[in-house]
């Protein structure tokens, strides 16, 4: 099962937070729509060692998805985007390969690693492109429609800077209008000047939980991301949400 990571804007830190969750919980990663190449998937996979599933739509230009698709002479059909299928393990090929504490191999091809991982752990972090109202098609289909199509709960990544309150409350309203479940907010400290009142205002006026405040990192590396502890309450929430989701299938 899966959770969806969206943000209040582009470059708000969705990939960093996705990487953080994958590192601490050992979940796989899936970015169904990518613009600007496969840099996000490559970063998460190389940083965490978990499988990064191939994007369904990937475009070379780092611009809005519907524009990138048009420039590439194609279009985005969200009905073609499904949660990755679970395949059989190739455990006979990896028994002698070093593993991490999550049972994931450190040195293994992406295909083989993904198949092994799926047997042990089928939980996935899905990362969106841009914010929830970014257009995907010229017919008006937006990222929020993809989230609704996948039927997965959402975590919103917000900035800690000026303007975050408005952007976050607008994002919440867009999701709530579609009756999409929001697990909570992660505040990403994108600079050293952290505005503490943002968190309080978002929690109060958005009637939602601040799951975590991610600190400003001067260097973004595996070690620096892993050094940011994930609270037990957030871990428990994510695990219980997916267990509950599984029980309904």
Swiss-Prot record:
Spans traversing the lipid bilayer: none
Cofactor(s), by name: Mg(2+)
Protein name listed in UniProt: ATP-dependent dethiobiotin synthetase BioD
Gene: bioD
Location, primary (coarse class): cytoplasm
Family: Belongs to the dethiobiotin synthetase family.
Residues annotated to bind substrate: 35
Pfam families: AAA_26
Reaction equation(s) it catalyzes: (7R,8S)-7,8-diammoniononanoate + CO2 + ATP = (4R,5S)-dethiobiotin + ADP + phosphate + 3 H(+)
Subunit structure, interactors included: Homodimer.
Species: Neorickettsia sennetsu (strain ATCC VR-367 / Miyayama)
InterPro entries the record matches: DTB_synth_BioD, P-loop_NTPase
Compartments where found: Cytoplasm
Protein's job: Catalyzes a mechanistically unusual reaction, the ATP-dependent insertion of CO2 between the N7 and N8 nitrogen atoms of 7,8-diaminopelargonic acid (DAPA, also called 7,8-diammoniononanoate) to form a ureido ring.
Assigned keywords, A-Z: ATP-binding, Biotin biosynthesis, Cytoplasm, Ligase, Magnesium, Metal-binding, Nucleotide-binding
GO cellular component annotations of the record: cytosol
Any one Gene Ontology molecular-function term assigned to this protein's record: magnesium ion binding
Residues that, per the record, bind Mg(2+): 15, 40, 127
Enzyme Commission code(s) on record: 6.3.3.3
């Amino acid at each position: 099962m899966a959770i969806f990571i969206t943000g209040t804007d582009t470059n708000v830190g969705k990939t960093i937070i996705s990487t953080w969750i994958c590192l601490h919980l050992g979940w796989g990663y899936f970015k169904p729509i990518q613009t600007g190449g496969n840099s996000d998937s490559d970063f998460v996979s190389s940083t965490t060692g978990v499988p990064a599933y191939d994007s369904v739509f990937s475009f070379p230009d780092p611009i809005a998805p519907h524009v990138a698709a048009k420039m590439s002479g194609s279009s985005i059909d969200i009905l073609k985007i499904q949660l990755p299928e679970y395949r059989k393990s190739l455990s006979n090929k990896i028994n002698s390969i070093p593993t991490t504490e999550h049972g994931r191999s450190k040195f293994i091809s992406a295909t083989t690693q993904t198949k092994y991982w799926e047997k042990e752990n089928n939980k996935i972090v899905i990362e969106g492109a841009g914010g929830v109202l970014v257009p995907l098609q010229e017919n008006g289909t937006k990222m929020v429609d993809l989230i609704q199509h996948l039927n997965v709960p959402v975590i919103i990544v917000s900035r800690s800077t000026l303007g975050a309150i408005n952007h976050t409350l607008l994002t919440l309203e867009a999701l709530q209008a579609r009756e999409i479940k929001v697990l909570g907010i992660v505040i990403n400290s994108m600079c050293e000047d952290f505005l503490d009142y943002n968190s309080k205002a978002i929690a109060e006026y958005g009637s939602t939980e601040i799951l975590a405040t991610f600190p400003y990192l001067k260097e973004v590396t595996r070690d620096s991301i892993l050094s940011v502890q994930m609270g037990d309450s957030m871990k428990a929430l994510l695990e219980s949400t997916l267990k509950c989701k599984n029980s309904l299938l």
